[in-house]
Amino acid sequence: MLLSREGFTIDVVARWLRNSVLNPYLSVPFATGLAVVSARKNGASGLSDVRFDTAQRVAFLVALASFVLSTTEYLNKWSANNWTTDDTWNFDKEIVVVTGGSSGIGHSIIKHILARNPRANIVVVDLAPLSWEPPRGSNIHYFKCDLTDPKALKTLCTLIRTQVGDPTVLVNNAGIARGYTVMEGSYTDVELTVKTNLIAPFLLTKEFLPHMVRNNHGHIVNVGSMSSIVPPLRIADYSATKAGLTAMHESLQLELKYIHKAPKVRQTLGIFGFIRTPLVPFDPGQPHFMMPLLHVDSVGEAIVNSLYSGFGRTIYLPGIMSSVAALASNRACTALRTTLTDS
């Protein structure tokens, strides 16, 4: 599509540029052609054309930029997946667990999976009842569970394994935000946020990972947030849990490769801006062109695309978040974080 679900944004412009000007299959041959023409022209006349030389330099810089971008993307993709492929993925046979699947991002993920595989085995884990009707003939299994209760979570995992099977895909999506300052929030607010957003994903991963490691096959998706990079006001506990989720993701990536010797177990991390869900029913008031309020299906589709690709990755939405993450990783860059928070 020419535009995104969010309308005309910087991501749309970036996609246009990436598919045209910054496409190395176009820019490199073009720059090479200009170089050949320039060499022949200068050789024949013994003179150089300033305007032509300027165009040639610009074409060379664009070609170089496109080559660097493509090379970086290539290295990021394969290093994140341990330079291995897994051709055994079959979503008619996989068992997918989605926490927080009764609405929002979780529902969108399930919807996009069913659009590709109507008979996919999907386990929905949520404390709230389903806000949608499962399609007739679909293999949707709903389990009600309070993920803040470790005993209930342990029982849940046993039930899933005995009634459905060992999951091969785990989507840690469930999350809450209480919306209080550090000083105003109660002990209960902090505990609920940390248990739901960080401890539950950690324990669920711990429960289902052994089967994935034994078979060297699986995919864990962690739904993160830009707040782990640029923490906004009033959700310090939420931001801390999302930063912890990112740390778990990165540490597990190393453990899978070097300790468990399961290089084909994939991981995907989503770094998302504000998304129009029950968690964010309001417009945060950020500049739409740079930081649009994301459509829930943009997020769900991106996650499902990653699952069906057979490769793990880090998803940045809006795309500008990748640049923000690179800059904000420098803890001395307080000006950037303050500016983004103020906006």
Predicted regions and their residues:
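Canonical Rossmann dinucleotide-binding motif of NAD(H)/NADP(H)-dependent dehydrogenases/reductases
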Residues: 77-121
